[in-house]
Amino acid sequence: MTIIADLTGTTATGHSSWESDARTRASRLEALLGDPYDPANPHGLRALFAADARSAPPAATEDLLAGTDLGAEFVPVEYGGRLSRADLLARVLRPVFRRDVALGFGYGITSLFATGAIWAAGTPTQRRRTADLLLGGGRATILHHELAHSNAILRDEFTAGATPGGYRLNGRKDVIINAERADVQVVYARTDPARGPLSHSVLLLDRARRDSPSVRHLPRVTTSGMRGALFSGLEFTGHPVPGDARVGGPGEGVALALRTFQVNRSLICGVVTAAADTVLHSAVRAATTGRRGPVARRWHKPLAGVFADLLACDSMATVVLRALSLLPDRAHVAAAAVKYVVPDLLRENLEELATVLGARGYEHDSPQYGALGKLVRDLPVAGLGHAGTASCQSVIVPQLRGLAEHSWFQEAEPPPELFRQGSELPLLDYRLLGLAGGGDFMAASLVGSAARLASYRGLGGQIAALAELAEGFVTELRALCEECRRLPAYGTATLTDPAVCVLSDRYSLIVAAAAVLGMWEGQDGRDPFLANPAWAVLALSRLGERLAMPVPELPDGCLAQVMEELVRRFRTGRSCDLDGIALAQ
């Protein structure tokens, strides 16, 4: 059964009440963190880069965040927290990630990743105690097998053998973020030696259960990126865990991982784009410093192109994060697609921006230009490296044949509120998140967008180009549909088959195109730039080139319009995302 929760109205300002509150908190946090380029700011980029160089957390900034009760952002509103929707959480966290990815993970977001299983399947007591812990400034961390991200940091495994009173936990993991600082640990442990969907269970360990002779704390591990985050290890040897520490049913660990990681994947992509925004500002600074006239024409394509890509990334992440509230049983494939596409786009974007920054990109301690090198190091450690691709493919590939046979070109479009910023959406409820089936609302949206734009084809100008691009992506979806219908039955296709991997590549880029079109159509006209098709045309053209599909020539003035907006946002101190918020200066 498809779940579409009831929608309520908006405030007089045109924004939902939850959204207005989130905007206020994000603006307050941005102001508290202050001008990132001020060398005297203890929370500015110079101070954060210095802490990173020392491989130390930025203590002053962590204290500042503690004073904002940031932990409340990770607690559902029904338990006294501020977690209303995932898209609004991303908005609140962006001021932190705009300055330092390691700070965003090390201080805050890891607690949400750890406690997602508790919000999804915990007992009332587990949920209440966890909420009280986070609301009181405590932290949680997560210990799991590589099923989470397929990241090299997450390869060790824990086992938990059944005992009359619960479990005996064994295993070692050398690289765990906040292993020493966390007040609770959520462990994904193998409880069944057989391979299969019921192999793992989730255990909740508090500090009292952790501090015992059967637990050994391992030394801190140095990482190439996120150097200010504290990674260390834990080893359990016959550690007793009571039965009431299990979260959910026995063998429910894999299902809980698949359900909760769709929030994690989408949220990471929604906040890390803010860090890339900082690098884009650095590149525009490099291209404009010392020039009285306009930016040199040779920099228009990379700068405007990266800006369009960031808007595409934000569109994709925002749509999926909103879907977690509006269509919670249908968002799992789109969540994997966003995690598949956004890291690749960001890596390519950083390479393009490096050409603009030139030698300035090597000024690693410079607040104006040092963000590039740090983000290049941080992204892989944050789970946004090449290693994370396989876990997304493992979600997408098994669904493709079923989507081709039963969903594509057959399913109704999603509610328009999915794409309308300011619409009131249901609260995020982890208990409603699905992990299989449910159709493909993004493909349906793409087909609908193309149909509405069809009458503009051949008329010339940007709207005609947008219509041509939309139809081009529908053509790609139709071709993909035919190929996916020929896939072998589920379980016989292998992720090591390059042809299968290419199908997930193509599908994920089509989802990105659908998000761009949906967000463009959902504009209410209050932002003239976003209501104009120029940014969407440029974003779709770049996505189409990655798909090697026929792409029309950019209409006259398209690149210039996007470039003009980028320079305007740089000079007026505004973010390069869909919100275009005022940044601290």
What are these regions (language model features)?
Residues M1-G108, R129, G434-L495, S504, ...:
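Amphipathic, small/basic residue-rich leader segments at the start of a protein or domain
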Residues L48-E180, P197-L198, S325, G388, ...:
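Glycine-rich flavin
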Residues T123-A131, G138, L143-L147, L154-T159, ...:
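Gly/Pro-rich turn-and-neighbor structural signature
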Residues R172-R216:
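A short core secondary-structure module
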Residues T223-L311, F419-A515:
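Glycine-rich beta->alpha junctions and the first turn(s) of the following alpha-helix
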Residues A274-D277, K301-D314, A336, Y340-E351, ...:
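Generic structural signal for well-ordered, non-transmembrane alpha-helical segments
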Residues V320-P416:
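Extended amphipathic alpha-helical segments with heptad-repeat/coiled-coil character used for oligomerization
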Residues S504-V562:
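C-terminal structured domain segments
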